[in-house]
């Protein structure tokens, strides 16, 4: 479909088919559309509202343009859409480290911050992790430690085509929604945080289309009136679960896991150095109860989708044991140490 036809279709408020959106994204990534056309398409899609077939079509195109890496069919990603304005520290990154120390194989896909002061890549860098490992080194890290961090710019180089357009637009677009779907390891087990019920429905549809084996899509309310893209310590957490093609919905409360309610302010983050200190304090046992419990709540979910336990309550027990026994602190040190050994071995230039 020509760009003019696409624009007319979106102006009329009509949805694109999966195939139309895949072709559209191919044209964008291959440099066939001008900047002005791309900006118009993104703005019109956002105004109309993106539907599942459009998201699935864009996903298919971007994965075809990506550098993929084979890690494990059991690997888990913990990733959120961002945009919830909760201002929390890097809970999903912390959860991935705790889950890894509990025996879950983690393939975390992430980037530097877009909507917060500190993204997953930022905080890992502050912990001493070098982001720019080549794929073969990342495979070695995963085999050795059970953890991989897949730095988005290395695996999705075609996204540079739209980076300046997204910056100039300054609004959320289709690309903000795609992040959790674009793991280069093509994981089939995920904990996905979203910031609305509508997005939960959308992601469930797309994850079914893309063959998810076990996924939890999470958003939560708070007493402060903020919607989070992670479990809440003082409100209701809404979970859409996908397992082997079946969709189930749950609601959770912190007290079900023995978690004491805590205000959102107790989970506030800051810059990458501040958030790295929080992660280190959780690992060494000196963090506040609220900081620890928020990480364990998400870790329980990662352990569950990773197949380490039969239910979320057992996942909480498994994650808590790993943290309190010192396994998480040891795992964090192991990951950073081997990452740095690989930097030397592969002559990686640090940014």
UniProtKB/Swiss-Prot annotation:
Which residues does the annotation say bind 5-phospho-alpha-D-ribose 1-diphosphate?
A: 80, 83-84, 88, 90-93, 108-116, 120
Residues noted as binding anthranilate 1 in the record, renumbered to the chain: 80, 111
Family stated for the protein in its record? Belongs to the anthranilate phosphoribosyltransferase family.
Return the protein name. Anthranilate phosphoribosyltransferase
Please give the pathway this protein is involved in: Amino-acid biosynthesis; L-tryptophan biosynthesis; L-tryptophan from chorismate: step 2/5
* Protein's gene: trpD
State the EC number(s): 2.4.2.18
Query: How does the cofactor attach, per the note?
Result: Binds 2 magnesium ions per monomer.
């Amino acid at each position: 479909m020509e760009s003019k036809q696409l624009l007319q279709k979106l102006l009329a408020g009509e949805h694109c088919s999966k195939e139309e959106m895949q072709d559209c994204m191919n044209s964008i990534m291959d440099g066939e559309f001008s900047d002005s056309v791309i900006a118009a398409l993104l703005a019109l899609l956002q105004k109309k509202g993106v539907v599942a077939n459009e998201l699935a079509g864009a996903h298919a195109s971007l994965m075809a343009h990506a550098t993929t890496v084979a890690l494990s069919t059991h690997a888990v990603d913990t990733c959120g859409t961002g945009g919830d304005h909760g201002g929390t520290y890097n809970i999903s990154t912390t959860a991935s480290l705790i889950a890894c120390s509990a025996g879950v194989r983690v393939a975390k896909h992430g980037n530097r911050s877009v909507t917060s002061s500190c993204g997953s890549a930022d905080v890992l860098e502050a912990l001493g992790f070098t982001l720019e490992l080549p794929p073969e080194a990342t495979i070695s890290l995963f085999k050795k430690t059970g953890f991989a961090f897949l730095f988005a710019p290395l695996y999705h180089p075609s996204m540079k085509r739209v980076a300046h357009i997204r910056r100039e637009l300054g609004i959320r677009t289709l690309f903000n929604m795609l992040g959790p779907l674009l793991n280069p390891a093509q994981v089939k087990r995920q904990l996905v945080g979203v910031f609305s019920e509508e997005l939960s429905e959308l992601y469930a549809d797309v994850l079914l289309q893309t063959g998810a084996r076990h996924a939890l899509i999470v958003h939560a309310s708070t007493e402060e009136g903020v919607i989070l893209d992670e479990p809440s310590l003082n409100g209701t957490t809404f979970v859409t679960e996908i397992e082997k093609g079946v969709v189930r919905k749950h609601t959770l409360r912190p007290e079900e896991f023995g978690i004491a309610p805590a205000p959102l302010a107790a989970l506030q983050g800051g810059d990458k150095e501040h958030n790295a200190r929080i992660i280190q304090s959780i690992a060494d046992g000196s963090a506040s109860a609220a900081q620890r419990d928020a990480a364990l709540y998400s870790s329980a979910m990662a352990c569950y989708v990773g197949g380490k336990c039969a239910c979320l309550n057992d996942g909480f027990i498994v994650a808590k044991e790993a943290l309190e026994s010192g396994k998480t602190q040891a795992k964090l040190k192991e990951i950073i140490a081997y990452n740095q050994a690989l930097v030397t071995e592969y002559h990686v230039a640090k940014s």
